[in-house]
């Protein structure tokens, strides 16, 4: 079911709780909500749809991957960038890693481990930050538009 996007910074600033098997529907709601916002974002965290659970969805090009209880287990090649967020206005400066390795559980409860790099790694890091309540005050910049080629606006 498509859910409304939460823009309450106080709510988004609170850490999420571990997901359980009972939270499968939240993953499906994230799929539906990301699909409905496809033109504006490439990833989401459950708190963005009002659920404080450790669940994210990340667009990996041709597929959207839902991750339950994702944890970054390794990272390398730090860089600075600016990102947008569907829950916040404007863009913000942040630090990311070019390459990460993330562990998570899939819809079947099977543990997965995946190496990500570039844009996909950036999206994943952004969404995992949401789970811990990390919010950086946005810097307003006029006429910011989502552009997958410039890779500046995460959206979620």
Where in this protein do the model-derived segments appear?
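Positively charged
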Residues: 1-156
């Amino acid at each position: 079911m498509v859910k409304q996007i939460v823009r309450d910074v106080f709510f988004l600033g609170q850490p999420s709780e571990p997901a359980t098997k009972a939270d499968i529907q939240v993953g499906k709601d994230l799929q539906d909500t990301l699909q409905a916002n496809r033109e504006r974002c490439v990833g989401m965290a459950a708190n963005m749809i009002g659920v404080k659970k450790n669940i994210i969805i990340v667009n990996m090009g041709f597929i959207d991957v839902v991750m339950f209880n994702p944890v970054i287990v390794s990272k390398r090649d730090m860089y600075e960038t600016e990102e947008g967020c569907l829950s916040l206005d404007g863009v913000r400066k942040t630090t990311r890693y070019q390459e990460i390795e993330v562990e998570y559980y899939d819809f079947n409860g099977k543990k997965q481990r995946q190496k990500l790099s570039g844009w996909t790694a950036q999206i994943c890091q952004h969404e995992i930050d949401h789970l811990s309540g990390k919010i950086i005050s946005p810097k307003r910049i006029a006429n910011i538009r989502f552009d997958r080629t410039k890779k500046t606006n995460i959206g979620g």
